[in-house]
Amino acid sequence: MQVILLEKVANLGVLGDVVKVKDGYARNFLIPTGAARRATEKAVAEFQARRAELEKVQAEKLAAAKAQGDKLAGKTVSISQKAGVDGRLFGSVTNADIAESLKALGFDVVKAQIRLPNGPLKTVGEFPVSVALHTDAVVEITVAVVGEHV
């Protein structure tokens, strides 16, 4: 299916690109989230008329994400979990736990924006974690997992 992108989509294209994607990806993800529209002649003409407005909205989103990223960059979030004597946690620290801690500090972050490259954190220590506030605004924070010894 041919779609026209209404925003930047990772590994696919940028605003205004007409790309061919699988029908299910377009129908179930891109179109419902507002990231794309079917690339009919009418839709392409309508997009060209609104292109400047859409580019302005995208630039504002990016500026807001970068501003939040500047405040968030380099922060250390401390999370305490029950742990054994050897430093392994009973359970794990997930992206939802990190997002909850960031919300407590006043940052508007959802769990889907937290990137844990090696999966959930299962040991005590400090770990670098990426937070993708926008496709072009990714910042690094440090998560300090503190063990509550049982």
Swiss-Prot record:
InterPro entries in UniProt: Ribosomal_bL9 (IPR000244), Ribosomal_bL9/RNase_H1_N (IPR009027), Ribosomal_bL9_bac/chp (IPR020594), Ribosomal_bL9_C (IPR020069), Ribosomal_bL9_C_sf (IPR036791), Ribosomal_bL9_N (IPR020070), Ribosomal_bL9_N_sf (IPR036935)
Does this entry carry the keyword ATP-binding?
no
Q: GO molecular-function annotation terms? A: rRNA binding; structural constituent of ribosome
| Highest rank taxon of the organism | Bacteria
Kindly state one GO CC term assigned in the UniProt record.
ribosome
GO annotation terms (biological process) = translation
On whether Ribosomal protein is a keyword of this UniProt record, the answer is yes
Q: SUPFAM superfamilies from the entry?
A: L9 N-domain-like (SSF55658), Ribosomal protein L9 C-domain (SSF55653)
Provide the alphabetized UniProt keywords.
Ribonucleoprotein, Ribosomal protein, RNA-binding, rRNA-binding
Q: What does this protein do?
A: Binds to the 23S rRNA.
**UniProt-listed HAMAP family:** Ribosomal_bL9 (MF_00503)
Query: What family classification does the UniProt entry report for this protein?
Result: Belongs to the bacterial ribosomal protein bL9 family.
In Swiss-Prot or TrEMBL terms, this protein is called Large ribosomal subunit protein bL9
Q: Which organism is it from?
A: Leptothrix cholodnii (strain ATCC 51168 / LMG 8142 / SP-6)
List the gene name.
rplI
